[in-house]
Structures are given as C-alpha cells and as structure tokens.
A protein has these predicted regions:
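Conserved core of the PLP fold type I
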Residues: 133, 140-272, 284, 288-302, ...
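N-terminal basic, amphipathic alpha-helical segments
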Residues: 1-134, 141-144, 330, 335, ...
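Residue-level detector of anion-binding/catalytic polar loops
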Residues: 217, 275, 426-427
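Active-site PLP attachment segment
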Residues: 74, 298-334
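Short glycine-rich anion-binding loops that position phosphate/pyrophosphate groups of nucleotides
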Residues: 119, 246-248, 313
Length: 480
C-alpha cells in the first residue's frame, strides 16, 4: 500500500491541484515513490485529502504529461522510472530562496536628470500617434500577419523619401533595413564587415561593445577639433570606420566637409574592402546652422557608407525603431545571411510611423522639438553662466544635439565629481566616461550635461546645484 506524505493547504494562493502535483513530483524525485509503484485511485486519494476528484485528476494528468507517471488502461497510474539529478543540482521546487545581499547605501533620489539619453515625453505627439494606431487597428488586420524581415515596404518607402529630402541620403527602399534599435542592426551588420573597425574616443561605448561582441576587433582612435583623426586612421589596420560626423558623441564636434571628403577617399582606396559606418546621431537637432548633408549622400547609393539612425531621440526611446541604409554591394551578403530571419519591429508600429512621416506629422513634430529643446538649451546655458564665474567654466557643444559640455577650469578629480553628483542628486556623466582607451587625461573635469528630460522650470535650479556639487568636489579633491 502506498503511504503519501502529501499535505495540502486550502488557504494557499497556489491551487490545490498544483500543490498536489508539486508534492507528488518531489516524492518521485526523492525516491519515496519508486518506479513501478501503482498510484492510489483518483476517488480514493481525493477522499483521503478531502479534495475533489478533478483536483487529483488534474495533478495526475500533469505528472503524466511530464513523464513522472504513465497511464495504463484498467490499472490507473504507475510511477515511471526517474533518473536522479546530478549531485548539487536541485529542481526548482527544492531550491532554497536566494540569500539577500546586504543592502547597499541608498543613493539620494535623483532630482536633476542630466543624462544624455533622456528625452522629453511631454513633447511626444500622443494624440496623433494614438489616432493613427487606432485607425490601423480597425482597418488593417493584415498587419497581424508576418511582414518583410527588412521592414514593411510602406515604412521603407517613407524613410527613403524623408532621408533624401532632409539628410541628402541617396538610396532605394530596398537598401533600407528596419530593426528594434541601433545596437540590434549593428550586431547584424558586424559579420558582414571585412576587418577591424576604427571607433572614436571619446566615443560611444555601446557601439564598440556591440562590434566586439560580434567578433569585430576595434581600434580606438582619437578625435580632434574636426572629428576622427584621419592621420590615426590611415596609420591603423582598420578596414571599417564607425563615426558620428553630424554630432560627434560626446564632444559635439561636427565633421567639416573637407574631413568628410578625406574619409571617403580613405575608403575609396580599397573598394569593397573598406567601409564607413555613419551613425547620424542627433542630426535632427541642429539649432543655429544648417546641417551638412550626410556622408552617405556625399558617397551615393553605390558608395562605401552604411547609414544608421534611430527614432529614439526624435520620438522616444521606448519606440524601438531604428533603420540602416546598406550599400548596394552588401545587399547580396545581407540577403544570404538573414533571409530566414523575422522582423523585430511590430507592423502596427511600422505602419504608424510610415503614416506619421508621409502625412507630414514628423517634420512638424521635429520643428516643435527643435524650438523646445533650443529654449531649454539656452536656459540651462544661462543658468550655468549665472552660477559659475567666467574663469571657472567654459561651455562647448551647444549647436547640435541634446547635451552640452561644461569644462571646468582648474578641475577637481573626476572621482570627486562623480561622488558629489551622487550626493547632490544629479544624474550626469563625465567626458572621461567615454574615453574608450582608459588612458586619456585631457578630458578631466568636463561634465556632459543632457537636457532632453530636464524640465524647463528646473534649469535655473540645476545650474545652482551643479555649482554646489563642483564646489564640494573641489574641496574633496584638495584633501586628497
């Protein structure tokens, strides 16, 4: 006769059938119920446990589905042979709860978010976006079916038109690939690249990480007043160059036309064996001068430039839509490698963005954003100039993008600045955070201040708080 140690708790939030299933499975794993043992009949066990027959039947069926029991006609359920887990391995139900780590010192709440990735959610066109999505939900049920892995044709057509008009990009819709984020697209591109990649330093750490994670060695090359150093590039073994020419991240430098031409000549000296990846970061937000055309536009549709951009800044980071323009010579390799892949952006979101662009909402939205962000930039710059003496601070990188640089004269230690920022409830980064070599010292004492998510009303207070934290950091540095 089988003696079960099962105890059920009717007050538990776990259903009775689930409790019974777990208990019996544990006994089988422990060897209490051995292979070949005939289980009690459902009615008998239900009576013993004071539960319904359905509860027992459900538990038995779950155990049978997972191979713990086998059902035999007229014989009921019998325990299957169970191979014990290796020593040290426990099934989920038998594991003890993880030991909580000792609590770290709680950081003061962030009062001023000056991170570079922030945008203002209040500028998002909620009403228009919701209306377009609602119309599509009711009128386009075909969007529930799988789409083109490169992105829906309507969106690629809309993007090609927008990029041609506003960024001078020369491409056919067939050259465009839509994906869930720049890092995703860069990761797919990496295996198609011919060799090591030059990356800017200070620069975008994620780009380097994505490339290296996908087998592309990176050469960290310096940035000067005109962008990536062509002297350093020519002396390297790089076959690929990853640049942010419209708004170098994080210095804010714009690569002039002459340097862009030199870069294209570098690639042209080895056709098919050298490529430029143009990350058109923050090109939408140029406040005081007209933007230069894209590198891709200078090179043409048959040129060696891969163009990358994203909607995370112009719309919102949560709308995971990025896009890439491939050179024609890479289309065959792309198709061969990724033809069986599925798209990573929902079709309703793609079609919403396509209509948002083609019906003129996108350009109006960008104009509204530029006006709002320019006013915020001016307010933050004015607050910094009011809080710091001219001999204490120099501002740079003001003309493009959603962040600026505050270069401290006679700067405190960067470690002291980081600690003071945490203490004073300010989230920001330092230029040295983007040094990809870990050896440069010229960037010390430079704050990288994003104002995308900073409320307009907080600009003056942010300037005052930054002054306080810099003073505290300097005092801390003097005691070292």
């Amino acid at each position: 006769m089988v003696h079960l140690t099962t105890a059920l708790d009717p007050a538990s939030a776990v259903p009775l059938y689930e409790q019974l299933y777990r208990s019996l499975a544990a006994e089988m794993r422990a060897g209490t119920l051995t292979a070949g043992t005939r289980m009690p009949g459902k009615r008998r066990l239900a009576a013993e446990l004071s539960v319904s027959v359905n509860t027992v039947d459900t538990a038995y069926q779950m155990l049978a589905a997972e191979g713990y029991l086998t059902a035999r006609e007229r014989s009921g359920f019998t325990v299957q042979e169970y191979l014990a887990l290796p020593q040290g391995v426990q099934p989920p139900a038998a594991r003890s709860a993880p030991v909580a780590a000792p609590p770290a010192d709680a950081a003061p709440p962030v009062q001023f978010d000056l991170s570079t990735r922030g945008v203002d959610p209040g500028l998002f066109p909620f009403r228009t976006w919701a209306r377009l999505q609602k119309e599509l939900l009711y009128s386009a049920p075909e969007l529930l079916t799988p789409g083109d892995a490169r992105g829906d044709a309507a969106l690629r057509q809309a993007l090609a038109g927008y990029l041609a008009e506003y960024r001078g990009v020369q491409c056919d819709p067939e050259q465009l690939v839509v994906g869930a984020g720049l890092e995703y697209l860069l990761g797919l591109l990496a295996p198609l690249l011919p060799g090591p990649a030059a990356v800017e330093t200070p620069g975008y750490p994620r780009a380097r990480q994505v490339l290296e994670n996908n087998g592309v060695p990176c050469r960290c090359l310096p940035v000067d007043a005109d962008g990536l150093s062509l002297t350093a590039l020519s002396a390297s073994d790089a076959a690929v160059c990853y640049v942010t020419p419209s708004h170098q991240f994080p210095t804010g430098v714009t690569m002039p036309a002459g340097r862009r031409a030199e870069l294209l000549h570098w690639a042209a000296r080895a056709p098919g064996r050298r490529y430029i990846i143009e990350d058109d970061y923050d090109s939408e937000f140029r406040f005081d001068t007209r933007p230069l055309p894209s590198l891709q536009g200078m090179a043409g549709a048959d040129g060696p430039v891969v163009y990358l951009s994203t909607c995370s800044r112009s719309l919102a980071p949560g709308i995971r839509i990025a896009y890439m323009v491939l050179p024609r010579q890479l289309l065959g390799a792309w198709q061969a490698k990724y033809r069986l892949y599925s798209g990573t952006v929902g079709r309703f979101e793609q079609q919403t963005l396509a209509r948002f662009i083609t019906e003129g909402y996108f350009t109006r939205h960008l104009a509204r954003e530029r006006t709002a962000y320019k006013a915020r930039r001016d307010a933050l710059a004015a607050a910094l100039r009011a809080s710091f003496a001219p001999e204490e601070l120099t501002l740079a990188g003001l003309h493009t993008g959603l962040h600026l640089l505050a270069q401290l004269k006679d700067p405190p230690l960067d470690a002291a600045l980081r600690a003071a920022a945490r203490q004073y409830g300010v989230r920001c980064s330092l230029l040295s955070d983007y040094d990809l070599t870990g050896t440069a010292h010229s960037a010390a004492g430079t704050l990288v201040l994003g104002y995308g998510s900073l409320p307009d009303a907080d600009c003056a207070a942010a300037g005052e708080r930054l002054k306080k934290l810099c003073t505290a950091a300097r005092e801390a540095s003097d005691t070292v």
